[in-house]
């Protein structure tokens, strides 16, 4: 590490002391035509207003404006940090107070995801209502963790079968993943009455070669990619407009999905849209003729995984009141509990090492 300003350093060949010279680089102030800065500020205002069709569901950050200028061929092209500075000077950006975050638990099993359609995250938002109506509506959201492509649909009931129909339809269009990650809602997992009996959604996943993965209970932030998208949907969609009819709601949901996939240029995708990024990727598609209602979903093989925190007692709760003693020495550590459906066995992993096994019938 370099010495700090004025730090005394001993020469190895002498007892003399000297001060390490400090090299200063001259900062070159970048200047851009006023019309470019005005274009940036106007783009921000129009994106926030969302009145123009092209900006209705647009992102408003400095990176998004940078990619827009790049697409327009603006020269000289200011970097995103300069655009951010201009927006801050104009009062368009409010400083957020940083939240004190706890250091991540090193035992949490992070699933490897280095290409498109390895992990999809699934979530359900709602209920919400139309103006003057008591009918409940839900928004089901699916997103690819790596490629950021999304699928959205409005549901009128919080039930498993419409969710399965949505998944099959989505995977026919965007390809099926290796893993589907979701929370522990009954609409995803199944009944508490028979905790070791797989729900229909998990059975359809296994039938299609997709491994269901359930995140820890009461830790929705573990589905980070979709939670980020949910915040965007709340701001751009649910809070920004009032829906008069169900037809209007469904139409705008489709428009939002299209906008996310075809206009949102993301730094994580090197400035590409999700559609552009995944266009040349070979996908595992689901046959257009696939009908889960006519399939035999009893004779299955595959794995269902649960990420669980070992409590002080040394136990984990897999589903409902189905508890397993792992050992007190593992308290406050996360384990990956994997059900081998064919072998009817539950295997517990910590740091990818098998530490316990249980019969699971």
Regions found by a protein language model. Give the residues of each.
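Basic, flexible linker segments flanking DNA-binding modules
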Residues: 14-122, 127, 199, 276-282
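Mobile-element integrase/transposase regions
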Residues: 76, 81, 88-143, 149-150, ...
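C-terminal, beta-rich DNA-binding module of retroviral/retroelements integrases
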Residues: 261-361
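Acidic/histidine-rich, metal-coordinating catalytic segments
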Residues: 158, 171-194, 216-218, 223, ...
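Double-stranded DNA-binding cores of transcription factors and transposases
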Residues: 1-12
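Mobile genetic element proteins and their domesticated derivatives, centered on retroelements
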Residues: 40, 65, 83, 123, ...
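Charged alpha-helix within mobile-element recombinases
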Residues: 194, 201-291
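A structural microfeature
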Residues: 151-152, 356
């Amino acid at each position: 590490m370099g010495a700090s300003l004025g730090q005394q350093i001993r020469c190895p060949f002498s007892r003399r002391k000297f001060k390490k010279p400090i090299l200063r680089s001259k900062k070159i102030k970048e200047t851009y035509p006023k019309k470019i800065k005005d274009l940036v500020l106007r783009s921000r205002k129009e994106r926030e207003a969302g009145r123009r069709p092209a900006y209705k569901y647009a992102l408003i950050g400095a990176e998004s404006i940078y990619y827009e200028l790049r697409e327009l061929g603006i020269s000289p092209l200011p970097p995103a940090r300069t655009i951010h500075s201009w927006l801050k000077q104009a009062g368009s950006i409010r400083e957020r107070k940083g939240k004190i975050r706890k250091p991540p638990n090193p035992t949490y099993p992070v699933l490897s995801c280095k290409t498109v359609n390895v992990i999809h995250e699934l979530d359900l938002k709602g209920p919400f209502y139309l103006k003057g109506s008591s009918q409940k509506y839900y928004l089901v959201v699916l997103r690819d963790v790596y490629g950021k492509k999304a699928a959205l649909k409005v549901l009128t009931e919080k039930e498993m079968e419409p969710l399965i129909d949505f998944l099959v339809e989505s995977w026919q269009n965007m390809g099926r993943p290796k893993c589907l990650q979701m929370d522990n809602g009954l609409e995803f997992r199944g009944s508490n009455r028979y905790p070791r009996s797989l729900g229909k959604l998990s059975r359809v996943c296994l039938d299609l070669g997709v491994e269901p993965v359930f995140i820890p209970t009461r830790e929705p932030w573990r589905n980070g990619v979709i939670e980020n998208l949910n915040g965007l949907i709340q701001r751009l969609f649910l809070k920004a407009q009032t829906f008069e009819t169900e037809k209007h709601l469904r139409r705008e949901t489709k428009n939002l999905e299209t906008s996310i996939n075809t206009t949102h240029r993301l730094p994580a995708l090197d400035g590409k849209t999700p559609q552009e990024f995944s266009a040349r990727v070979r996908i595992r598609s689901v046959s257009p003729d696939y009908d889960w209602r006519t399939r035999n979903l009893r004779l299955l093989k595959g794995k269902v995984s649960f990420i669980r925190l070992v409590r002080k007692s040394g136990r984990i709760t897999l589903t409902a009141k189905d508890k397993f003693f792992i050992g007190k020495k593992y308290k406050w550590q996360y384990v990956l509990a994997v059900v081998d459906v064919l072998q009817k066995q539950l295997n517990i992993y910590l740091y990818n090492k098998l530490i316990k096994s249980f019969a699971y019938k």
